[in-house]
Amino acid sequence: TDAVADGEHAISGVVDS
């Protein structure tokens, strides 16, 4: 749940679809 290069909104708060 490290939304960096993933399409999930996590603790990072970065949603990269």
Curated annotation (Swiss-Prot):
Major subcellular site: secreted
Keywords: Secreted
The family this protein is said to belong to: Belongs to the Frog skin active peptide (FSAP) family. Septenin subfamily.
Function: May act as an antimicrobial peptide.
Tissue spec. comment: Expressed in skin glands.
Residues that span the membrane, as ranges: none
Record-given protein name: Septenin 1j
GO cellular component labels: extracellular region
Compartments it resides in: Secreted
